[in-house]
Amino acid sequence: FLLNLSINRKLPKSDGFRLYRNNESELYLCSVFFKYLVFIIIPKILNSFFSILFSPRETRYSVAYTYHQNHTKLLSQYIEIPNPEGRFLADPFVFAYNENNYIFVEDFFYKDNKGRISVIKIDGDKNEFLDVIIEEDFHLSFPFVFKENNEIFMIPESHENLDIRLYKCLEFPYKWKLEKILMSDVSAADTLVIKKEDTWFMLTNICSSKSIDHSELHIFYSDNLKSNAWKPIASNNLVIFDPLRGRNGGLFYHNEKIYRINQVHGQAHYGKSFNVNEIILLSKNEYIEKE
């Protein structure tokens, strides 16, 4: 090359930009593309095609329950609550009141593509749908219900209204009123609150990217449940960005331990499964959980 350059006093003619320099590399590229086409693209196209042909036109969920002590019952042994016509039930939260058990649910109406909050009374293998108890001009879901100082509160998801709102029960289980807007101008989903000593912690799902999958777990704290100035825990504490762990699914207490349920989302599959995580540490400075 250098000898030719010294004799001709010019660079050899270029064939133009080439990502690969020889036929062997080009064959490898074709092989990779073929495998990608066969194993990724074509299955996706076929899956979408068959989904359109054979899947139900409308998304449907349902709620089921059971009684047990050791958390070992199979889902097939649960009692399914029938969906009302033209609707589906989702996001169940169980609440005990005066020796009776109630399930608060998202009650989604297909006719206006909007969820309300409804309540069902359960008694053994019998269940009674009571009524829609909270309805707004926007979608509501995930009715996280809890008790504090003999008062009953609920934080339903209201991300369409760009806020996090606290409702107070005036007459159980039917009558509720909006007590406080805890956060404004935020698209947050599936909010939970935990009280530890004199501090309230809010675990909620927000997307930093402004998308609507709400896959990040953000944690705030306040000394007052009804505050509208919640602060994030220490800035050096990492928010959970993992879509396989971030999204809240519920909360329960067992043997003096706190457990957070998280939803697991697959590719184009909302609510593929769930995990149970023990909350090891929750403070103004740090959050640690283990599966």
Spans of features found by a protein language model:
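Carbohydrate-active catalytic/glycan-binding domains of CAZyme proteins
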Residues: C30-E291
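Donor/substrate-binding cores of folate-linked one-carbon enzymes
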Residues: F1-S25, L29
